[in-house]
Amino acid sequence: MAALPRFGPPVAGGPRPVIAIMGCMVQDIVVKPLSPLVAGGSTMSQIFFAPGGFGPNVAWTAALEGAAVRFVGQAGADTVGGALAESLTEVGIEVAVTQKGTTCCVLVLVSDDGQRTMAYDTSSFSLRADEVTADQLAGVDLLHLYENMFDDITAAGAWKALRVVRAGGGMVSLDVGNIARIQLVGREQFLDRIDQVAPEVLFANEEEAEALWPTGRVRAPGLVVVKHGAWPTTVYASDGEELVTVRVPAVDAVVDTTGAGDAMAGGFLAAWARGCDVNEAVEAGHRTAGAVVSQYGAQLPPTWRGAGDPGPPRHQGDALNAGSS
């Protein structure tokens, strides 16, 4: 079975590798219309608030799966932002955030078949290089990033985090994020950025993979995990060789697909940190994603317990806070 890059010799009962995940605390506003929307009219709907955000979602799932997780990023300098950041500690996540601006809100419109359409405001990830510190990333074994963090506004902070973790001997995983980014940046420039980041593992969905590699020949610095929704997930080697294809277990009902990709990444990363092989890591991601799509909201209940066996984290420490600006 194909192996994932190793964090070091596993020690029974020893400290766990530390996974740092960058992102922005987000308040999701989930809307499930109870009848078809009518232009210019009003529609009775189920509406509720839920924590969200790519990075927090991945961090939450990985922690529930037994990983030692640190969230490094941004929260609004308001009551909601502080509460969202504090909520991550409920599942044992170390929090190292800069609080500034207002909390980012995302409107999530859920259709009858569970598919979601999102609209987000402009209060998203915008960390400068001086807001990302070496202390926040000390002892990190794996850094998980999203491609849009390398946008002009946030590029300096993301590159600094990458350099700090690489200098400490850590590895990197990268999520393509969404098809709109490829269309905005351009295919060749997007591929160049992937090469520059050089992630050990790259996550993409089917649409993103087709946009990046239209000939079907996958090329990347490391492993590439391509998700196909309810269809099997395929993992490719850097030279395009197909390593494994893993079936996605059926769920009783798809309620809301919000956060499915984040949950898959979180489960995968936690399994990787446990020393699992590629097949086992994908299976772990499928399990967590399946649980998320069976409910409303992008984060599982804090009582969820996955396959991980939480032991002492490799690097102990209190929750960090970079201060506000």
Predicted segments, located by residue:
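Conserved beta-alpha-beta core of the PfkB/ribokinase-like small-molecule kinase fold
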Residues: L142-R219, L223, A230-T233
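Phosphate- and divalent-cation-binding pockets in alpha/beta enzyme and binding domains
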Residues: V80-A83, V106, A211-L212, P232-T234, ...
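Hydrophobic beta-strand scaffold residues
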Residues: V69, V95, V172-S173, V224
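Conserved phosphate-binding/catalytic region of the ribokinase-like
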Residues: M1-A20, T43, P214-S325
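Conserved N-terminal subdomain of the carbohydrate kinase-like
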Residues: A39-M44, F49, L64-E147, D309-G323
